[in-house]
Amino acid sequence: PDDDVIGDSIIYYEIEDAIPTPNDYEYAIHEDANLISYLGIDGVSITEALPDELEQHMHSIVGEGVAAIQTDNGWIGSLDAFERNKGYWLKNIITDVDTILYFSWIIPDEELLFSDGMIKEVQRPETLNNFKYSQSSKQAFYFIDKINLNDISLTSDDWIIAYNNNVVVGARKWNGRYTDIPAMGYDGYLSTLGYCEDGDIPDFKIYIDKTGELLDVVSSNVEPWD
């Protein structure tokens, strides 16, 4: 059974006679963003799961509260392994509307992956009690290149918090350069009221875990949310 949420109500429903998607299902990838389900093994990295001929055209991949972007040095971000039967947005760099790429997930031998240590534990994003937010069906991610805090050095216990007009819309533990911060958007539900909408520019603050300080992040290079 699954459920849907309308306002503060929950409606339960069941899907009968569903046909499982075969592991070798072939997807058609069009320009820009495509929402597809992952059919492989839990914990397989992006590079191991995507065929080379598709990966070279990928810009970024977004899951529920996690994201990765491809750089010259490989993939960076909080999404480093896929989770079976979860949906992912694959955004590509195809510019020709008539170009279609076809692919199937690479599903290697599971025992071989374990023996080679290539399967990663799928990590759910941590949350911070005083800065909780709701997962939205609309989300964007901001990647931090570097932060200058004079004499303060960030640790892996510190957090970056995203706000929209003083409403917390995302948070992520500091993970060094290219830490990605989710910024949730308003998707019509009460739980996301006040969240980002097209054109909004979120604010960011740093939460120092050791002292409880909340420091403003000043940047002139924050793209509008969309």
Language model region names:
Residues 1-226:
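N-terminal exported-region signature
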